[in-house]
Swiss-Prot record:
Cell compartments where the protein resides: Cytoplasm
Entry protein name: Ribosome-binding factor A
Compositional bias annotation for Acidic residues: 145-158
Name of the gene this protein is made from: rbfA
Disordered: annotated segments: 130-158
Length: 158
């Protein structure tokens, strides 16, 4: 993808700017009102551009709205490609493939899991702060052994 070819990376950034601004300013489709272009990846041969998008405020939970937005993007694909070609000045304009970006939704799930884990850690820390050993500190050490150890040190010093 765009990682190995610097020209592909520049074209991907250009496509992202053009598609995002066109969705916002030129396409007057209500289905695309909350669409955000998150990333564009262009193949090294500059033939295909995958445009990753997400919906603001929905995190992918509204399946019906997501499908309607995908339909609107697919319908506007030709118009957006011609706008990209016009603004980029490329001889061959890459084909646009719109892919829903799952990363933001997954990131929210991971954040929720981490918040639960942090809350459990805090509860355990509170319990540990007031916890005491169930018995003696060392149940195998007896008083007579402690005295014998003390006597050994006294006899060595003499």
């Amino acid at each position: 993808m765009a990682g190995t070819n610097p020209r592909a990376a520049r074209i991907a950034a250009l496509i992202q700017r053009v598609v995002a601004s066109s969705i916002e300013r030129e396409l007057h489709d209500k289905r695309l009102a909350s669409i955000t272009v998150t990333e564009v990846r262009v193949t090294n041969d500059l033939q295909i551009a995958k445009v990753y998008w997400t919906q603001l405020g929905h995190e992918g939970h509204e399946e019906g709205e997501r499908k309607r937005a995908q339909q609107a993007l697919d319908q506007a694909k030709g118009h957006l490609r011609s706008l990209v070609g016009h603004k980029a000045g490329l001889r061959l304009t890459p084909q646009l493939q719109f892919v829903f970006d799952e990363v933001p939704g997954e990131a929210h799930e991971i954040e929720d899991i981490l918040a639960v884990a942090k809350k459990r850690d805090e509860e355990l820390a509170r319990v540990r702060a007031t916890a005491q050993y169930a018995g003696d500190a060392d149940p195998y050490k007896h008083d007579d052994e402690a005295e014998a150890e003390g006597d050994e040190f006294e006899s060595d010093e003499e």
